[in-house]
Design a protein with these regions (language model features):
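NTP-dependent small-molecule kinase module
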Residues: 22-23, 52, 162-242, 253-264, ...
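Hydrophobic positions on the alpha1 helix immediately C-terminal to the Walker A/P-loop
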Residues: 47
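Hydrophobic anchor at the beta1->P-loop junction of P-loop NTPases
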Residues: 36
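Conserved lysine of the Walker
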Residues: 44
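Low-acidity, Ser/Thr- and Arg-rich intrinsically disordered low-complexity segments
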Residues: 5-14, 19-21, 25-26, 259, ...
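ATP-dependent small-molecule kinase phosphotransfer cores
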Residues: 60-146
Length: 274
């Protein structure tokens, strides 16, 4: 009977292991939707590229995109930034149509394939910019969330509009377009910050910090918070310091974390694994 008892225990443990791996697989198969938001001139596009490059170097399958897109509706929106903004309702409609195409053609297929999708702007920008023009922030938020997949995390890079306009003029050598006027930026920033207070998915970062500091913070947050929640065993039934899947090379999160640490400088490594 003792032998039978041990056999049953072994079977039970094997089933538990299979069950746990099934949970992990089903959770990670969706992919991760990561969004960067903020007013113009915050350095979002640079940070999107840096994060995408780092994750790709660690072996993750990454899709990098932006809104407005380069599709027909996105091109119309971009053209209006220089030629004169569309009427508020028409502009919102163009953003909705552009986003629907973006979701159908890229975002949803990428997530269903288990990829990390990183976006430079998403529907939060519509809530902030078009909400500021139309004055119906809550209605726009409801409209956008009715068809757009919820992101796993939103990195909001916050900066004073005066500083952002100086960056646009000095760094880009450009004259601010119709979306980059001080009044519009102030109103959008206020809405962004309000959204950050209400939505736990939004993590706010200080855009006044150096590019390297922001990059390091973003990588740490993504790997040790977002990715960990999606792929790590610790929240299920073990401890990192004594984790058998990690020690045996079966923990996706631990492997990615170590791979990133191996590819980064010593300063990044210290921040990443501390």
């Amino acid at each position: 009977m003792p032998g039978l008892s041990m056999s049953l225990v072994g079977t039970r443990l094997s089933l538990l292991t299979v069950w746990a791996w099934t949970i992990i697989s089903s959770m990670t198969s969706r992919g991760l939707l990561t969004v960067f938001e903020g007013i113009d001139g915050t350095g979002k596009s640079t940070q999107v590229r840096l994060l995408a490059d780092a994750l790709s170097s660690a072996g993750l399958d990454v899709i990098q995109s932006k809104e407005p897109t380069d599709g027909p509706w996105g091109r119309k929106i971009r053209a209006s930034a220089d030629s004169g903004r569309m009427a508020p309702a028409e502009e919102l409609d163009a953003f909705v149509k552009d986003r629907r195409e973006h979701i159908e053609n890229l975002i949803t297929p990428g997530l269903e394939a288990g990829k990390v999708v990183i976006l430079d702007r998403y529907y939060y920008s519509s809530i902030a910019y078009q909400g500021a023009r139309l004055g119906n922030v809550e209605e726009i938020a409801r409209q956008m969330s009715s068809f757009a997949p919820l992101p796993d995390v939103v990195f909001l890079i916050d900066i004073d509009p005066v500083v952002s306009l100086a960056r646009i003029s000095d760094s880009r050598g450009e004259i601010p377009n119709q979306f980059e006027q001080i009044a519009s930026l102030n109103a959008a920033r206020e809405i962004f910050n309000q959204l950050a207070e209400e939505d736990p998915r939004i993590l706010k970062l200080d855009g006044n910090c150096s590019l390297e500091s922001i990059r390091m913070t973003l990588l740490d947050l993504f790997v040790n918070d977002v990715l960990r929640k999606a792929t790590c065993y610790e929240s299920k039934w073990c401890d990192v310091s004594n984790c058998l899947p990690a020690k045996s090379g079966r923990c996706e999160w631990y492997n990615i974390r170590q791979s990133l640490a191996d590819r980064l400088s010593s300063s990044y490594t210290s921040a990443l694994i501390s």
